């Protein structure tokens, strides 16, 4: 199967969502391990061409320096991938808060979107990301629900 579009991307957030250090939880899967698993995956000769990336710990500190973000971009590219969509850390319990909340919550929500835009700008300028969106949702219920 040969194609140029759409590019096939793997989402990195399953390595984080529902994971943790509490009793009964599976530990988060490291970014490098997720990239290695993605690089090894193949069905009928088709492999992943890129990743879609959740901008939160432990994979990424959303407040990381440009140099730290470039190092992450280099790791992703070294595995043969480009970065596509970025998932802004908008939920309560990450950086953001509900878009439907009070003024303080809405400010946190917008700050999280701005952080994602900054990361996108660094990845774009560094050459690791040439297309994609910044994914957001209302974050109405947060990560606890």
Protein language model annotation of sequence segments:
Residues 1-133, 143:
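N-terminal pre-domain/capping segments
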């Amino acid at each position: 199967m040969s194609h140029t579009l759409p590019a096939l991307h793997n989402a990195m957030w399953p390595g984080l969502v529902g994971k943790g250090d509490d009793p009964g939880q599976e530990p988060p899967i490291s970014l490098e391990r997720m990239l290695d698993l993605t690089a090894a995956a193949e069905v009928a000769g088709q492999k992943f061409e890129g990743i879609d990336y959740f901008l939160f710990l432990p994979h990424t500190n959303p407040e990381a320096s440009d140099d730290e973000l470039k190092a992450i971009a280099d790791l992703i590219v070294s595995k043969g991938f480009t970065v596509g969509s970025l998932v802004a850390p908008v939920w309560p319990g990450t950086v953001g808060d509900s878009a439907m909340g009070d003024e303080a919550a809405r400010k946190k929500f917008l700050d999280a979107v701005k952080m994602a835009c900054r990361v996108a700008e660094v990845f774009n300028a560094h050459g690791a990301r040439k297309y994609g969106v910044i994914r957001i949702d209302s974050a109405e219920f947060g990560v606890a629900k």
